[in-house]
């Protein structure tokens, strides 16, 4: 019964998200409904002590990233930089390659360490402009961005600095470059299968006479009265964000050390911060600030008259995206604390093959919690020792465990209630009903990829 309660809460939230209801409202309703059916006396403590703690903790850490990312994306749009880059890309590659260009831009940014949430805000203006000029249905933008930002550069490509590739290293004593050949094989599979799927969907739409669409929501502004800047100037803030993010990731620990104690005259006690936990967040915030300043410096004349309204729009978008994701994060924390979740975790331990066991466990928990990093953290915290023991018994290198766990986390995490999916749809002005089925197909490709990697390892022994 406890398992049914947990799954029912998940089903309710997924249904609410798919039908367009606010996740900010339904995440606590679904989570606390499950608590009510489990232990009515625990509803209030679970809401305050688990749901709100996790939700507020997420906002505390990540809202500045959402805000700066939204402002950066809006300025890229208002300055005409997005149109300039799109025009150059179309001249270079032609309109037939619009989806490939967007996938590669997303991949470049995420592999450079830019948060996938930031990529959504920053790339959407480019994608909308390119899809409009190429007359590709707007509903395919989310799946295209998802392929570039939420898949192979998130957890498969060796060396990626995304958190999904870092978490396994703390459990298996590996590095971000673990099992490089398996990672490359997984990357090639996801990229090729994903592009084939997107191209197939585009061809089907073209045959049906479906174009970009009309009367759409949240469309980037397309001012016709501005002179388009040089595409290299337009591209420079985007490149600068990736480069500075990488540099700040190395500089911040050198400046502050492992911990930093802040003691200002008005403080009753010093505040000690563990720098390692905040390095990635501080780095991307600093990089985005520099990117914003670059856009303002190069495009202020075009932006000036629209800056007030544009900044309001960006702040509104950031608030909605952050609250959606934080509410989902709180939901996952509550569900993970229920008896049904523990029963499910224990059942998963019974799967005999260590790599298949790990892959199924991580991807299922990522799906239930709606978070790749959250599901993987829960799975590895509870079961990493058993995975390691089984791997040693089967002579499987721990590097393979790392790569399988990372890739599995990015499989079923993108179900309808996933925070990144909700953010992506909110930013693009689309609904689950309009665009989610294409995202789900990318999810299936990504889920299948980890089993392709496992089969490759057993067939060849390559690592």
Predicted feature locations:
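Hydrophobic core segments of alpha-helical transmembrane domains in multi-pass membrane transport
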Residues: 5-17, 28-37, 66-71, 105-110, ...
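Core transmembrane alpha-helical segments of multi-pass membrane transporters/permeases
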Residues: 25-28, 48-83, 108, 275-340
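Hydrophobic alpha-helical transmembrane segments of multi-pass integral membrane proteins
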Residues: 63-69, 92-129, 322-330, 351-389
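Interfacial loop-to-transmembrane junctions
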Residues: 89, 93, 424-445
């Amino acid at each position: 019964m406890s398992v049914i309660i947990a799954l029912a809460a998940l089903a309710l939230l997924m249904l609410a998200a798919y039908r367009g209801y606010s996740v900010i409202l339904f995440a606590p309703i679904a989570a606390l409904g499950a608590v009510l059916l489990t232990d009515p006396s625990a509803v209030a403590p679970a809401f305050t002590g688990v749901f709100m703690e996790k939700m507020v903790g997420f906002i505390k850490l990540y809202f500045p990233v959402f805000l700066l990312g939204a402002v950066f994306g809006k300025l890229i749009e208002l300055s005409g930089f997005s149109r300039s880059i799109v025009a150059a890309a179309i001249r270079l590659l032609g309109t037939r390659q619009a989806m490939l260009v967007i996938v590669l831009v997303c991949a470049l940014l995420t592999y450079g360490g830019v948060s996938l949430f930031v990529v959504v805000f920053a790339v959407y203006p480019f994608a909308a402009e390119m899809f409009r000029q190429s007359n590709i249905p707007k509903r395919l933008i989310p799946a295209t961005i998802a392929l570039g930002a939420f898949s192979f550069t998130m957890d498969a490509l060796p060396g990626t600095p995304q958190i999904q590739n870092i978490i396994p290293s703390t459990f298996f004593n590996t590095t971000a470059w673990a099992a490089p050949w398996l990672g490359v094989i997984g990357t090639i599979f996801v990229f090729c299968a994903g592009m084939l799927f997107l191209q197939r969907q585009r061809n089907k739409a073209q045959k049906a006479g479906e174009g970009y669409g009309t009367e759409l929501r949240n469309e980037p502004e397309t001012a016709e009265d501005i002179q388009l800047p040089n595409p290299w100037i337009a591209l420079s803030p985007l490149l600068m964000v990736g480069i500075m993010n990488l540099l700040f990731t190395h500089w911040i620990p050198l400046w502050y050390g492992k911990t930093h104690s802040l003691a200002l005259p008005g403080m009753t006690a010093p505040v000690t911060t563990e720098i390692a936990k905040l390095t990635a967040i501080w780095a991307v915030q600093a990089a985005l600030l520099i990117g914003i300043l670059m856009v303002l410096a190069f495009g202020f004349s075009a932006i000036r008259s629209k800056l007030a309204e544009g900044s309001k729009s960006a702040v509104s978008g950031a608030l909605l995206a952050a609250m959606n994701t934080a509410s989902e994060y709180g939901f996952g924390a509550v569900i993970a604390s229920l008896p049904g979740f523990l029963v499910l975790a224990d059942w998963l331990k019974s799967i005999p093959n260590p790599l298949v066991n790990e892959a199924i466990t991580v991807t299922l928990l990522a799906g239930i919690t709606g978070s790749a990093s959250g599901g993987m953290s829960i799975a590895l915290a509870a079961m990493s020792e058993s995975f390691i023991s089984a791997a040693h018994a089967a002579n499987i290198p721990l590097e393979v465990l790392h790569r399988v766990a990372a890739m599995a986390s990015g499989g079923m995490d993108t179900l309808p209630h996933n925070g990144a999916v909700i953010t992506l749809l909110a930013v693009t002005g689309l609904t689950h009903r309009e665009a989610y089925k294409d995202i789900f197909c990318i999810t299936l490709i990504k889920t299948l990829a980890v089993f392709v990697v496992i089969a490759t390892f057993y067939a060849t022994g390559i690592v």
